[in-house]
């Protein structure tokens, strides 16, 4: 028997319910769709707002990044034919043997670049005391400093602009030269390094016409020309290097604005492609040279700039035969910190060079009435490494500038103020004393020159600086440290 299949027609109320369910299902799907669309729209809006905010708040962010990359990828070759002149101030009464090398004077170098300036002079300085009035003396030897000041005062009428970045003066007397310059049209900015880094602006350099420059140990002080032993370098016709040094000046200049703060990072226009890893390839005195400028402290160094301490340690580590150092102060401490802090960075690298590589290390350190007694304790520690049994090649001498009774009365004079180092590979001319404070929070700078590729040349800059060091080391003013029963016997007038 076949079964019957009955088909029940859908009742009207069932059909309505089915339509209702389908309608509700479409509504649920629609709500989900609209919710998803709303979420996507909100996300897109937020992203757009963030991007718009960045463009409004940091309009140069992407440009700065691209510019920095462009600066750092710049060709490190320079086509300038630069002329390098090693310059010195030899204090009156300090006389070398007849055959000794005497370099051109810092005074004559400054006069040359002032009188030949065509458009601009920028000077980064610690303080100004170019006249007898500044030091409350009546010294005929102040004449050179007074001439320098007069030439600088006359720049405006020659159409030459003068900018001066200077540390805050510590007394009204130290403000007189600056006030006179401002009255004659110079632009002066006081860089409040004590507030910015808890240090000082200790650097000493000039940039002239973006083409020539001086860098070295001499302050803007008449005593630095006739009563203090100084060393520096003047480089002529070298726009590549001059403009790179000017970037360091511009950093000081911007920090001299009211309520200035340290930028982090520095904008791209302060960056440099020239450093210890990629030095500038340039001709100095017709000799192929690798050159860069270092700076301290680290917060003042823009992208690409080698920090001054890193430069010094790298030069020591790079030496193969010898490291000769001539500085006023040497101490593995932070001299001005409270509480006291030990700071062995440079000291460790010197000991390592002696012990591991048998490098010959010589330190020629200044000795005068303002020397810190603690410095000699640390120097004795270095000198103790040298003995007939150890065969470690490290020697320490102190340099004493002689003084007459009249010269003893000149304040803060009669001292070897040099701040340089020379190795078998590199010449380093700086502006800082060698203790921790000068590299941690004090502004300084240095010129680093390597002419090793031209080892056959008889007059490389390394050789010139080595000659100066050996002249001083072998002079009657240099005393073997181990033979001194008391540093006070020789240093205190």
From Swiss-Prot:
Residues 1-37 are cytoplasmic. This is 5'-3' exonuclease PLD3. GO terms for molecular function: single-stranded DNA 5'-3' DNA exonuclease activity. Belongs to the phospholipase D family. It comes from the Eukaryota. It is found in: Endoplasmic reticulum membrane; Lysosome lumen; Early endosome membrane; Late endosome membrane. The keyword Transmembrane applies. It is an enzyme of class 3 (hydrolase). It comes from Xenopus laevis. The gene is pld3. The active site is at residues 202, 204, 209, 417, 419, 424. N-glycosylated. Proteolytically processed to a soluble form that is stable within endosomes and lysosomes. During transport through the secretory pathway becomes proteolysed by cysteine proteases, thereby releasing a stable soluble lysosomal lumenal polypeptide, whereas the transmembrane-bound fragment is rapidly degraded. Its transport route to lysosomes involves ubiquitination and the ESCRT complex.
């Amino acid at each position: 028997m076949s079964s019957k299949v009955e088909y029940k027609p859908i009742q009207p109320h069932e059909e309505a319910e089915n339509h209702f369910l389908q309608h509700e299902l479409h509504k649920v799907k629609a709500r989900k769709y609209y919710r998803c669309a709303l979420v996507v729209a909100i996300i897109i809006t937020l992203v757009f707002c963030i991007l718009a905010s960045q463009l409004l708040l940091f309009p140069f962010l992407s440009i700065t990044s691209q510019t920095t990359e462009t600066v750092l990828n710049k060709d490190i070759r320079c086509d300038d034919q630069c002329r390098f002149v090693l310059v010195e101030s030899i204090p009156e009464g300090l006389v070398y043997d007849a055959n000794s090398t005497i370099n051109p004077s810092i005074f004559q170098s400054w006069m040359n670049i002032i009188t030949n300036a065509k458009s601009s002079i920028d000077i980064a300085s610690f303080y100004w005391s170019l006249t007898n009035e500044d030091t409350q003396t009546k010294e005929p030897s102040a004449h050179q400093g007074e001439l320098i000041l007069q030439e600088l005062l006359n720049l405006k009428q020659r159409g030459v602009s003068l900018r001066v970045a200077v540390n805050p003066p510590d007394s009204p007397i130290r403000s007189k030269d600056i006030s006179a310059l401002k009255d004659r049209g110079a632009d002066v900015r006081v860089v409040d390094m004590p507030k910015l880094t808890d240090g000082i602006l200790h650097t000493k350099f000039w940039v002239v016409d973006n083409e020539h420059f001086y860098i070295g140990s001499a302050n803007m002080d008449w005593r630095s020309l006739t009563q203090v032993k100084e060393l520096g370098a003047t480089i002529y016709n070298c726009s590549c290097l001059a403009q790179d040094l000017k970037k360091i000046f511009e950093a000081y200049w911007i920090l001299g604005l009211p309520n200035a703060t340290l930028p982090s990072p520095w904008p791209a226009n302060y960056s440099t492609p020239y450093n210890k890893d990629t030095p500038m390839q340039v001709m100095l005195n017709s000799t192929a040279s690798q050159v860069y400028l270092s700076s301290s402290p680290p917060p003042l160094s823009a992208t690409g700039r080698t920090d001054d301490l890193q430069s010094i340690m790298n030069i020591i580590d790079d030496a193969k035969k010898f490291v000769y150092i001539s500085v006023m102060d040497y101490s593995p401490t932070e001299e001005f910190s409270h509480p006291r802090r030990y700071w062995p960075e440079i000291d460790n690298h010197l000991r390592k060079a002696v012990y591991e590589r048998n490098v010959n290390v010589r330190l020629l350190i200044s000795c005068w009435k303002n020397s810190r007694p603690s410095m000699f304790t640390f120097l004795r520690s270095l000198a103790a490494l040298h003995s007939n049994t150890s065969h470690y090649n490290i020697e320490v001498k102190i340099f004493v500038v002689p003084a007459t009774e009249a010269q003893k009365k000149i304040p803060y004079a009669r001292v070897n103020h040099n701040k340089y180092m020379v190795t078998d590979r590199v010449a380093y001319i700086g502006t800082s004393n060698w203790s921790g404070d000068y590299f941690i929070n004090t502004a300084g700078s240095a010129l680093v020159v390597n002419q090793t590729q031209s080892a056959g040349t008889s007059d490389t800059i390394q050789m010139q600086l080595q000659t100066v060091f050996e002249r001083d080391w072998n002079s009657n003013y240099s005393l073997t440290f181990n033979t001194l029963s008391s540093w006070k016997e020789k240093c205190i007038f």
